[in-house]
Amino acid sequence: MKFTPRCVPLWLGLAVFPVIAIAPLARAAEQMQAYTFAQPSQPLTQALNAFSRATGQSVVYTLELPGVQAPALNGTFSAEQALQQLLGTSGLAWRRVDARTLTLEAVGTDGALSLQATTVTSQMDAYSYQPPASASIMRGQGPNQDIPQAINVVPAQVIRDQAPRNLDDALTHVSGITQGNNFGGTSDTVMKRGFGDNRDGSIMRDGMPIVQGRSLNANTERVEVLKGPASLLYGIQDPGGVINVVSKRPQLQQYNALTVRGSTYGSGKNGSGGGFDSTGALGDSPFAYRLIVDHEDEDYWRNFGVHRESLVAPSLAWLGEDTQVVLAYEHREFRYPFDRGTAFGSNGHPLGIPATRRLDEPFNDMQGRSDLYRLEVDHQLADDWKLHFGYSFNRETYDASQVRVTGVNEAKGTLTRSIDGTHNAMSRDQFATVSLAGNVELGGLQHDLLLGIDHEDRKVFRGDLIRQTAQSSFSYVNPVYGQEVEGSSVRASDSDQTDKLRTDALFMQDAVHLDDHWIVVAGARFQQFDQYAGRGRPFKANTDTSGQAWVPHAGIVYKVDDQLSFYGSYSESFKPNSSIAPLTGGVVLDASVAPEEGKSWELGAKLDMPGSLTGTLALFDITKRNVLVANFDSGTGETVYSNAGEVNSRGVELDLTGQLSERWSLIGSYAFTDAKVTKDPDLEGNRLQNVARHSGSLSAVYDFGSLFGADRLRLGAGARYVGERAGNATNTFDLPSYTVADAFATYETKLDEHNVRLQLNVKNLFDKVYYSSAVNQYFVAVGDARQVSLSSTLEF
């Protein structure tokens, strides 16, 4: 389907229709919002703290709570339903004072409430930067404090404040993250602890894999990161970690928001957009809907190019007491500039041209569409047991044209270029999972159990590959564009690029609570896989392999108290060696070539102060073995492939996010990452490409609170630092370090009793020229220039 902005009015019309039709019914519905809980059975005090973190309605009380064990709480409930279940037979009852205030009251022996002074005031700020106590990326394993791996969360309020343009933007305050080859600015490529590429399968949507090039959009609630090998839960992966983009879900409480946006890079490079978000109950039933519509149309910040993107995301949910079902669909159409950036000269420095000057042609872009279908079913089998089923199908298609730099003549100030393209590209992924989570007491010890089955079927296909030589050289000093036309010569030997992967897996984990302080965790995954890859007309298979693997995981946690814990863990990952491109000598990668294996040791500490700060300190050492290495045999003149390669990444990471006080919020991080090749005939000792040895960030927000009655003002600013990085695998040039600052301001007021929010964001405040990643010296990504954007949101 070709992108056309003419469909936007229709979509906006479709967006408004449900509000007109459903609002009268929704207003009659019970005014309650649904929250997702994953709390183990624990002392009532701890359970109420976790409840507050999940709902923003902290329970602060003056009476002495009975020393009882609250039941496990897993699933989706309103705050009232969840609190009722937690209180159980404690002898306490709840009473709501207002929308964010609850009161606990003792029930007398005669069943009457004791109305002695026990007022509960909400301590949890709706604008808090503190993340939830549990992350869905762990597939229902309980509080993050009990997990012997680093987990980072970019909370919903950070997303709202910083208005990230893509996943790279959203993760700037997570330690150990740098950008990799982002395919000309069209794909999310996140390097985690030194590992990752743009097809590594490490990005999830609601815990299920996706193939979309860009995964962050208006339907995003928050972003979660699990650091280190994650094959126990997510199968075939590099050992750096996985990322989970959590979607907004239907709510029973009626909410509508209409947003309009405007932006500028200066010099006439402007943009506009808008969005609509509506959710609520359908009549008096437990059904809830959500509809999100968004459109963006902006000029690219360099000398030509446009970015257009439209999103329609309807979803429907059944929110019963024991069973919750979510059915969601997401349709996206996009047009991106396909920009390979600038080039570096033989002196290891960028060419002496303005950062805005492109080295390609105006027809360099990518146009496509994607569709994502998702079904989730959660059923509470008993107080301590939850059954989960998930299914997703997602597909993306695109056509891309590009002019690529193939050489630089610095003496003449000219470039040689090729005219390339990809037509009829398609990626799809089908995934299904069933898991059971719960806890049981055996031998006097509590066991938190997780068992599951996964199935995945993924295909990446690139149809017609355009390859042809430019008609003439190009002056980068005095450029004249328009001398070339889009390529049309299909190279048969490069076309029909295909990569198929099918996997089936069984995983299990047991977390044993030895006492109130010690938790021992052990688990394993058994995975079978089939991978087939190749290219060409006629088709030539270059990978045809299958196999199976056991992947273990073990860890130990010592909880000093509810707020501080220490942990240690050992984890493994695996990833089959594969190649779409032909290998020298016609070698086919088969079952005789062992998969890459990652082994990681990690030590750390976690701080979690309800209503205040959440922090993680981690020390890690990851080794990836069986990396495919090409060895040229001078005697036979042939290249022999072996699993002799090895890389290592070790370092320290610190993350902190939350509230310093009622007025101050912050999110920040620091990482030291020493990543290098440890075994390779040519590259041994080299630093891994695009990985910074030092990186860090800090962003702070000051909330002025209520001004002029109900009005509210918040100001925030921050900066991120990324150190020097190797620009290629051979380490012949480096990308310089950089520091980039951002700022924002929000002002909230009332308009006829409706909330109105004005927000100003400034990206790259000081208009710093910087280089975010590189493929080689001819493809060096240039960071975006300063952008000023203003949005206005009306809630009704």
Language model features by range: what are they?
Residues 376-392, 396-404, 566-567, 595-659, ...:
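Membrane-embedded beta-barrel scaffold of Gram-negative outer-membrane proteins
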Residues 296-300, 313-380, 393-427, 470-499, ...:
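Acidic/polar loop-and-plug regions of large Gram-negative outer-membrane beta-barrel proteins
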Residues 449, 568, 689-796:
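Conserved C-terminal beta-signal and adjacent last beta-strands/turns
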Residues 313, 317-319, 427, 446-458, ...:
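Structural signature of Gram-negative outer-membrane beta-barrels, strongest in the C-terminal barrel
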Residues 333-351, 457-462, 530, 557-602, ...:
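Surface-exposed extracellular loop regions of Gram-negative outer-membrane beta-barrel proteins
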Residues 53, 58, 72, 116-253, ...:
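Acidic, small-polar-rich N-terminal luminal/periplasmic segments of exported/outer-membrane proteins
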Residues 621-623, 642-728:
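Gram-negative outer-membrane beta-barrel transporters
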